């Protein structure tokens, strides 16, 4: 069966299913499943023409300064994967991406590697969260995209482009905090509660963007992060000790 017939038949079988075009960290299958425990029915690699991969979604300056989105860019293209899912699963994905506080959903037309075209929804940074210029993402975040691109079989030339991107350097303590927090995010996602971690990151982002003195910002961060990191360490340890099936 060709990819064209497979895509067309899937649409005929369920008109309510939603196609999402993943191009950032959601390229990585384990992250996609762990972040929101998503169940994807079908997936196909493809490219989005006249758009670019942008790192212009404002994050937390000291932890994750930028996240990926797509922006119009004539002559450029973004490679990624088409994901077919139910409306319920798509709502879980939206919750895991900040509950509409970070991204808007744009309708795009993606060309699969087999040449067929499919309309899909992609995430683009809200104007209120968009930075005037792109900022390099962290290596942790960028590696999720790179590994996901390889696992999904994206074009070698595009993977080379991803490999050439610069990343934001974090210190050892920040790396540890980041590792624990994102482990916690995956744990909450696996139990169907991705919004808990999203709200934590929204609070940290609000503190980061506030006009508070730096000393007060760090006091607030420590107050919030201390119990969060203890919980993250417990969840991470439980996950590591869980018997392998």
Where are these regions (language model features)?
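Glycine-aromatic micro-motifs
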Residues: 2-245
């Amino acid at each position: 069966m060709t990819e064209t017939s497979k895509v067309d038949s899937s649409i005929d079988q369920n008109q309510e299913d939603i196609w999402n075009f993943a191009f950032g960290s959601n390229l990585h299958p384990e992250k996609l499943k762990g972040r929101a425990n998503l169940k994807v029915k079908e997936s196909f690699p493809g490219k989005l023409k006249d758009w670019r991969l942008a790192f212009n979604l404002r994050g937390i300056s000291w932890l994750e300064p930028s996240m990926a989105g797509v922006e119009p860019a004539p002559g450029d293209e973004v490679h990624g994967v088409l994901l077919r899912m139910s409306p319920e699963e798509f709502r879980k994905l939206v919750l895991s991406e900040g509950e509409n506080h970070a991204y808007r959903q744009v309708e795009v037309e993606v060309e699969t590697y087999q040449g067929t075209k499919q309309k899909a929804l992609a995430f683009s940074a809200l104007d209120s969260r968009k930075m005037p210029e792109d900022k390099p993402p962290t290596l942790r975040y960028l590696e999720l995209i790179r590994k996901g691109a390889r696992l999904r079989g994206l074009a070698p030339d595009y993977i080379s482009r991803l490999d050439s991107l610069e990343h934001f350097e974090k210190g050892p303590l920040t790396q540890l905090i980041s590792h624990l927090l994102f482990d916690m995010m995956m744990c909450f996602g696996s139990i169907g509660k991705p919004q808990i971690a999203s709200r934590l990151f929204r609070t940290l982002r609000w503190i980061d963007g506030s006009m508070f003195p730096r000393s007060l910002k760090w006091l607030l961060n420590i107050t919030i992060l201390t119990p969060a990191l203890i919980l993250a360490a417990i969840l991470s340890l439980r996950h590591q000790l869980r018997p392998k099936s």
